[in-house]
Swiss-Prot record:
O-mannosylated. The modification Methylhistidine is found at residue 18. Keywords: Carbohydrate metabolism, Copper, Disulfide bond, Glycoprotein, Metal-binding, Methylation, Oxidoreductase, Polysaccharide degradation, Secreted, Signal. This is AA13 family lytic polysaccharide monooxygenase A. Cu(2+) binds at residues 18, 108, 238. Binds 1 copper ion per subunit. One of its GO terms (cellular component) is extracellular region. It comes from Pyricularia oryzae (strain 70-15 / ATCC MYA-4617 / FGSC 8958) (Rice blast fungus).
Amino acid sequence: MKWSVIQALALASGVQAHGYLTFPMSRTGLNAQAGPDTCPECTILEPVTAWPDLDSAQVGRSGPCGYNARVSVDYNQPGPRWGSAPVVTYKGGDVADVQWCVDNNGDHGGMFTYRICQDQALVDKLLTPGYLPSEAEKQAAENCFRAGTLPCTDVNGQSCGYSPDCSPGQACWRNDWFTCKGFQDTKCRGVDNAPLNSCYTSIAGGYTVSSRIKIPNYVSNHTLLSFKWNSFQTPQIYLTCADIKITAPDSQSPPTTTTTSTPASPPPTSCATPAASVAVTFRSKTTTSVGQTVKIAGSIAQLGGWDASKAPALSASQYTSSNPLWTTTISLPAGATFEYKFIRVESSGAVTYESGANRVYTVPRDCAGTATVDTAWK
C-alpha cells in the first residue's frame, strides 16, 4: 500500500526521474548536443514496474535505446546525428570508465546497469539506417541486453554494494547491478558527490554518476552499450544507448626462446617510450567583457574536479576583438579520459558554465608529448 501511495504521489506531482548516458556519449546526448533533443534526460519508459523487480517490465516502443516522447524521437534507429558510427573503441577485456547524468529535480534513487548484447543480428536491427524495429524486435534485443549485463563485480577492487532501499529476498537484492545511495540519503548524486552542473540536463542541472565496467571478450565493428536505470521512487525506467566498437584483446606475448636477436628500431610513427604526460593546449574562442575571465573546469584533479575555484584560468594574451582567443597549456596524464567545460567568471566571482552537454577529451598516447584542442564557447 505504501509503495502504491508513493507512486501515485510522484506521478500526480509531475515529478519524474531524469537521466541519460553521457560517457560514452549516448545517441540521446548527441542529439541534445546538436540541439533537437531539448530534454535528453526525459527519455522515460513509464508507467512500468521498476522496483523491486528490475527486469520484469517489457520495453515496448522504448526498446533498449529509449524513446523520448517529449521530442518524439526513437533512438532505436540511426538518426541524422547519431548511430552512423561508433563514438568510442574498446578492446575486449578493457576496464572502462562510464558515466551518466542525473537531473537535480529528478533524482529518485534506485539501481542501474550497463549491458552489451552479443547477438549481432539483433543489434544490427538497431543500426540499420531507415529501419525502425518493431516492438517485438525491440523486446528481443532487450532480452539479449539483459543477458549481457556487465556486472559491477567484474571489476577488481570496485565497491559493489546492495541498495539501501532493498531487502534480502527481494529481486533487487543483487550487486551485479550498480546502486545509488539510499533514497533518504544522497540518492544517485551521492555516488560521485559531484557539484551541480557537473553534467548537462535541461531541467535543473545535473550530477555525474560514475562507474567502471569490464568489456567482454567479444569483437564487433559496431555494436551498442545500453544503459538502464530503474527508479526507486517512481514507476519509471531509463534506457539509452551509445554506439561503440570492440576489437580483439591484445595478443599474448610469444614464449621466450634462447635465440638472440637485435631489437628492432621503432617504426617511424611510433617510439620506444611514449610520453607519460602530455602538454595539452586548450584554445577557446570566447567573447568576454572587461573584468571577465575564462577558466576550464572538469572531472579530473588537474581541472579542479568541477570546483570552479580550483579550475585553471586561461590567458587572454592572444585575445583580439576579431579573434577572441583564450588559451592555456596543462600537463595531463597520457590516456586519461575526462569531461570538461569552459566557464566565464565575472569580476564579482559569479560563474557561468557553457551550455549543452559536457565536452569529452582523451589525452593521446604517443611520443609527441603535446596536443592542441581548438574550441569555441557554446
